[in-house]
A protein has these predicted regions:
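Intrinsically disordered, metal-sensing/regulatory segments
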Residues: 1-246
Length: 246
């Protein structure tokens, strides 16, 4: 059973693990293993959106929930205008370039938004009408995606800032963003903002759809698949399918 300490520590640990692989294992956002992990996360996120989250939303809401899924898709499109697509591993780094603060803030907003519906689910764990069955899939979808994003961010931090301390400081701040969203979801009732949990989840589903489809089509050079990346995407999809029977 998931609980808030496990969720929060897992997200923080995933981001710091991404930074560790860059600093101590000399990995980067261009490393083959990282590209495969990104492809896997894209397949997983796309599958849980279609097989878990969207069916659950439409079971509780009318067709109008689709507007909020579209809103989430468009929000992510706007955020990527500032982030440069770092959410799906698309980042260009140059030695000693100035760190783009807008990118960091955009990525942070993205991470906070993702955490909010998970916090709603954790707070409503005893609610018989809550999305308990999808809490694990949403948690895993965010978690799997955090590691390659953290690797891309740490790569950019190292190239743009000569101070290792500052690089780790920025990464640690980013590691707290999704947990912050979880806490907001737990302690700030959606109703107090004139919303409900389904609307917030629908926005995140839209974000998932944008990121996962972009990952799938941009996961290799020249937008061409190779076999390993295709297999990684399929494994991500299959793992999401198995959650229906766990």
């Amino acid at each position: 059973m998931l609980n808030s300490p496990v969720v929060i520590l897992s997200f923080i640990g995933a981001v710091l693990a991404g930074g560790f692989t860059v600093v101590y294992l000399q990995a980067s956002h261009k490393t083959q293993l990282i590209k495969l992990l990104l492809a896997y996360s894209g397949g997983f996120m796309l599958s849980i959106a279609f097989t878990h989250l969207i069916p659950e939303l439409y079971a509780h809401q009318s067709f109008q929930i689709g507007y909020f899924i579209l809103l989430g898709f468009l929000i992510q499109l706007i955020l990527e205008f500032f982030s440069g697509g770092i959410e799906h591993g698309h980042v260009h780094v140059h030695k000693n370039q100035k760190f783009p603060l807008a990118l960091f803030l955009s990525l942070s907003v993205h991470s906070v938004i993702e955490g909010v519906p998970l916090g709603n689910m954790l707070e409503g764990i005893s609610d018989p009408h809550g999305h308990h069955h999808d809490m694990e899939s949403l948690f895993l979808g965010i978690l799997f995606h955090q590691i390659p994003v953290a690797i891309a961010l740490m790569t950019l931090l190292i190239k743009s800032n000569p101070s290792p301390f500052k690089a780790w400081l920025f990464l640690a701040a980013f590691a707290l963003m999704t947990p912050l969203g979880v806490l907001v979801g737990m302690f700030v009732p959606a109703e107090s903002l004139g919303l409900n949990q389904d609307i917030i989840l629908a926005v995140v589903v839209g974000i998932f759809l944008h990121i996962s489809t972009t990952i799938i089509f941009e996961t290799s050079e020249n937008h061409k698949f190779n076999l390993l990346k295709l297999v990684s995407i399929l494994i991500g999809c299959l793992f999401a399918f198995t959650l229906n029977w766990l």
